[in-house]
């Protein structure tokens, strides 16, 4: 009896750990999102060559978030981060209409990788504060998200600089990764 109570207690109250990979085209806002979540403030960023990794604590969950540079020359390196990824955050600059097709192509290329077959997908439609930003419905269409029949996905409108939508996205991730394990 004592052992089963201990198991139940630890399941309810032990910190859960989740491995998250955050990718997207360059200048989409990945690093700004990472440090807004980690520090609660806006940091001055430069283009990420390589990666940033931080642990973000939220609601008894420890998210290890890998923010990988998005410049086209380093995108082939993304696959080196796929192993053991439970959740994929794909960040889209909602104001960048010129490169949304490029974003779609990169997203679908990644989702076809065997190592990511079980990862849930959260799309952050970032930069919603800009006047010409595409809304979530438009991003869903442009990224072809409805064609993802076998993939559990969600889109969250965000503004990295204000933090709007970021924690709602983490809530969805934690609920959906937890339900798969």
Curated annotation (Swiss-Prot):
Primary localisation category: Golgi
Domain of life: Eukaryota
MF terms in GO: GTP binding; GTPase activity
Pfam family, one: Arf
Catalytic reaction(s) noted: GTP + H2O = GDP + phosphate + H(+)
Keywords, alphabetical: ER-Golgi transport, Golgi apparatus, GTP-binding, Hydrolase, Lipoprotein, Myristate, Nucleotide-binding, Protein transport, Transport
SUPFAM superfamilies to which the protein is assigned, alphabetical: P-loop containing nucleoside triphosphate hydrolases
PROSITE patterns associated with the record: ARF (PS51417)
Compartments in which it is found: Golgi apparatus
GO biological process, one term: vesicle-mediated transport
Protein's UniProt name: ADP-ribosylation factor 1
Native source species: Daucus carota
Gene name per UniProt: ARF1
